């Protein structure tokens, strides 16, 4: 499957009486991603399997994945159809999501994000200050 692969954005039955709506017809994977077409996302997840989807999320640096979390007697797992739509139990950090999407634009190469507060030269002078501002 490539960004040029074609997928049908159609109403898609996900079981349990639930349907993900789609109406654009045949679109490229690139278009499906750009337009955030939910039907295409879930169809792709079913095609490659949710296990593979979880593996890719791990490879792309998503650190909040849950496989077996019990809260008030209820068990949660991100290894489900909701993964394709971003429905993670504990959410996702924005910088991780940005770096995962950046890998698509970088020919599939993932670069771990680096956050900084300041950059100094060899004499200790501040070259870049990323500490930000706050006010009330």
Spans of model-derived segments:
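Short acidic/histidine-centered micro-motifs embedded in hydrophobic/aromatic stretches
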Residues: 9-10, 56-60, 118
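Conserved catalytic neighborhood of penicillin-recognizing serine enzymes
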Residues: 2-53, 122-136
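Active-site-proximal helix/loop microenvironment
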Residues: 64-124
């Amino acid at each position: 499957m490539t960004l040029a692969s074609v997928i049908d954005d159609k109403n898609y039955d996900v079981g349990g009486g639930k349907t993900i709506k789609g109406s654009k017809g045949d679109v490229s994977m690139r278009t499906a991603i750009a337009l955030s077409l939910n039907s295409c996302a879930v169809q792709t997840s079913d095609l490659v399997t949710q296990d593979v989807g979880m593996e890719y999320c791990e490879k792309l640096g998503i650190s909040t994945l849950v496989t077996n979390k019990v809260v008030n007697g209820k068990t949660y797992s991100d290894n489900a159809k909701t993964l394709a739509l971003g429905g993670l139990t504990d959410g996702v950090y924005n910088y991780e999501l940005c770096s995962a999407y950046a890998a698509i634009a970088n020919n599939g190469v993932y670069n771990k994000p680096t956050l900084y507060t300041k950059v100094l030269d060899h004499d200790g002078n501040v070259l870049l200050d990323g500490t930000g501002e706050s006010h009330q």
